């Protein structure tokens, strides 16, 4: 549930963008309330950045107010849809980059001026694309996410004689087998903790085999392609890994997968680079693992690194906000060079290449930072939001792990995707 805090407002310098209320010529005379919905990742991992930005906004706009509300991923979309329908939407909302197109197409977001935001000329292209429609910018990239292998080097050392994560999948599977044998007395120990509904991972294997979730055809429509042979290969490969190496509850999703390692139940898992910090953080994990938990590139089945989903978040100003200029200025501040550097310093991938490039040579971020150029993304289709909301792909994976054939499960999933993907959700 969200944590609400009434705070004096915050923002950085730059020209106001969008419509609605405009900031006063003298910022100290500007009034209004800016309600911001941020995901609880910020509350858990970079609350100091949030506080600094809010303090700066308060200093610039002393007569304005900020209401900050932290949201959880599980129910944010439902809450936002209701808030928009009821006419009480936030002024600023954080959107996962697979969620943005739904709200762009529904007219829920206000356009913003790209030129007024720091580093906009070097934004990561895949992130900027999620905010762009008909040559207008409807949101601002916030941070990127690329998935990597997170592993306990001590567990690998004990079982294989090497603390290093294997560079090829063949070597990785051999190492996982040795780890499994070493820990066979513990039936809850997973050499590779790979959650069954983890569709971001499953689709990475689909991408590795040359498959895709959906394609845009010559008639101008999207259609599901999970039933294609290459996609089926990737899905089968993923399911085989889950069955063999995940000794936990196969129905559990990846939201708190770091806990398996923190509790001593996993030697490795596939996640966002920042999840390694959660494994060893005193509040969420086991600090004694600090020297053992490492990150590495996840090898794929084709002799190359496993293609990663380019995850991340965007920040948008809602179209009916009475404080559009103030809201856009808060976003400008929160995505400034200074703010993005604060994220980079915490091993979070910033929204632009200028600040991303140094992370390619940093041991704790190299695997994720170098994965960004070859990353894949979900279809930028009108109804993709509905496909996600209906959990079509996680449900397909669950059915396969319960015994449904890959052929039938993918055929059914494509049919469900086809019903939704071309209609704005």
Predicted features and spans:
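Conserved N-terminal structural module of periplasmic/extracytoplasmic solute-binding proteins
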Residues: 1-102, 250, 302, 325, ...
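Extracytoplasmic/periplasmic substrate-recognition and gating elements
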Residues: 55, 59, 157-159, 236, ...
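Extracytoplasmic "Venus flytrap"/periplasmic binding protein-like
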Residues: 56-123, 132, 157-160, 264-268, ...
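A structural signal for short loop-to-beta-strand junctions that line the ligand-binding cleft
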Residues: 90-91, 119-155, 190, 304-307, ...
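Hinge/lid segment of periplasmic solute-binding proteins
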Residues: 97-146, 205-208, 290-296, 361
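Long, aromatic- and glycine/proline-rich binding clefts that accommodate carbohydrate-like moieties
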Residues: 126, 130-131, 293-297, 343-391, ...
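Extracytoplasmic/periplasmic solute-binding protein
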Residues: 138-142, 147, 171-223, 266
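Glycine-centered hinge/linker elements that transmit conformational signals in sensory
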Residues: 176-177, 220-250
């Amino acid at each position: 549930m969200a944590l609400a805090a009434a705070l004096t407002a915050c923002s950085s310098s730059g020209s106001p963008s969008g419509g609605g209320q405009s900031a006063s010529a003298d910022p100290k005379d500007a009034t209004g309330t800016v309600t911001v919905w941020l995901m609880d990742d910020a509350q858990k991992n970079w609350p100091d950045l949030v506080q600094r930005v809010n303090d700066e906004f308060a200093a610039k706009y002393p007569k304005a107010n900020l209401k900050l509300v932290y949201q959880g991923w599980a129910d944010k979309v439902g809450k936002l849809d209701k808030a928009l329908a009821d006419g009480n939407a936030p002024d600023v909302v954080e959107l996962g980059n697979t969620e943005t197109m739904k709200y762009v197409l529904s007219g829920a977001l206000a356009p913003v001026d790209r030129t007024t935001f720091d580093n906009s000329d070097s934004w990561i292209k895949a992130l900027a694309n999620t905010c762009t429609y008909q040559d207008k910018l409807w949101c601002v990239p916030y941070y990127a996410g690329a998935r990597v292998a997170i592993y306990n080097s001590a567990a690998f050392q004990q079982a294989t004689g090497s603390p290093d994560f294997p560079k090829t999948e063949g070597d990785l599977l051999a190492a996982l087998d040795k780890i499994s044998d070493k820990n066979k007395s513990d039936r809850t120990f997973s050499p590779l903790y790979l959650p069954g509904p983890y569709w971001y991972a499953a689709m990475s294997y689909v991408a590795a085999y040359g498959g895709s979730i959906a394609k845009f055809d010559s008639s101008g429509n999207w259609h599901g392609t999970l039933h294609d042979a290459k996609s089926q290969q990737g899905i089968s490969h993923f399911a085989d890994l889950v069955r063999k190496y995940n000794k936990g509850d196969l129905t559990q999703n990846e939201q708190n997968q770091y806990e398996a390692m923190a509790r001593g139940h996993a030697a490795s898992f596939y996640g966002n680079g920042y999840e390694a910090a959660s494994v060893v953080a005193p509040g969420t994990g086991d600090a004694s693992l600090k020297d053992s938990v490492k990150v590495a590139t996840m090898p794929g089945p084709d002799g190359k690194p496993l293609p990663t989903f380019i995850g991340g978040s965007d920040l948008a100003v809602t179209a009916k906000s009475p404080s559009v200029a103030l809201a856009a200025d808060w976003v400008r501040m929160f995505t400034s060079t200074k703010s993005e550097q604060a994220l980079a310093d915490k091993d979070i991938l910033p929204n632009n290449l200028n600040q991303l490039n140094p992370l390619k040579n940093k041991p704790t971020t190299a695997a994720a930072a170098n994965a960004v150029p070859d990353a894949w993304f979900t279809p930028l289709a009108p109804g993709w939001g509905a496909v996600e909301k209906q959990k079509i792909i996680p449900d397909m994976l669950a059915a396969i792990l319960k015994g449904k054939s890959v052929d039938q499960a993918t055929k059914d999933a494509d049919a469900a995707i086809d019903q939704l993907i071309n209609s704005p959700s």
